[in-house]
A protein has these predicted regions:
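Short coil/turn segments at beta-strand junctions that form active-site/ligand-binding loops
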Residues: 12, 35-36, 96-98, 127
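Gly/Ser/Thr-rich loops at beta-strand to alpha-helix junctions
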Residues: 19-24, 44-45, 106-108
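N-terminal phosphate/diphosphate-binding loop that engages ATP/GTP or pyrophosphate donors
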Residues: 30-80
Length: 174
């Protein structure tokens, strides 16, 4: 069974949050879904290799690109080759594409996310939210917490993020 079927994906905006596989999940969903798909972000994301990147505030350009490619990536260029949210409102993109899949959380490539109070950046228009956690987090109980959990706790407690104030513990399996 396809992942998009297991998630009961519906047309419209879907936010993907968490850590350890969000970007990979976006790519898989784009491949599996029938219909037009826009991959984008409400935070930061790297462009997808092999998927056309569109930077525009012209909805007609978006429609033409979707007619040619079926799957596109959209965003606004930012530092370090990353993209931020697209210039067009997400609701406008949802009118142009069957699916708009939004990476709505950052985790700095760590396998587990402890969100701060203002995270994740889930759009009010999102019809569904998919939470992701990397399975690698289950095997790292012996490593310092700060080395595998994105530090949302730091900003909530105003204390340095250390293992002593880490409230997330991976199960110990041998």
């Amino acid at each position: 069974m396809k992942i998009c079927e297991q998630l009961h994906m519906t047309k419209g905006i879907t936010a993907v949050i968490g850590s350890g596989g969000k970007t990979t999940l976006l790519r898989i969903l784009a491949e599996e879904l029938s219909g037009t798909v826009i991959l984008t972000t409400s935070t930061h994301i790297l462009p997808f290799a092999g998927i056309p990147l569109l930077v525009t505030d012209d909805i007609e350009q978006v429609r033409r690109a979707l007619a040619l490619h079926r799957v596109i990536c959209m965003g606004t260029p930012a530092a370090e080759g990353k993209l931020t949210a697209p210039a067009l409102p997400f609701s406008v993109l949802a009118d142009a594409a069957d699916y708009v899949i939004v990476e709505a959380d950052g985790s700095k490539r760590l396998p587990f996310k402890v969100p701060a109070a203002w995270e994740p950046v889930i759009l009010k228009e999102a019809r569904a939210v998919v939470a992701v956690a990397g399975l690698a987090a289950l095997r790292i109980h012996a490593k310092p917490c700060a080395s595998w959990a994105h530090p949302g706790l730091e900003s909530q407690s105003n204390k340095p993020y250390t293992d002593r104030n880490c409230s997330v513990h991976a199960p110990v399996h041998t």
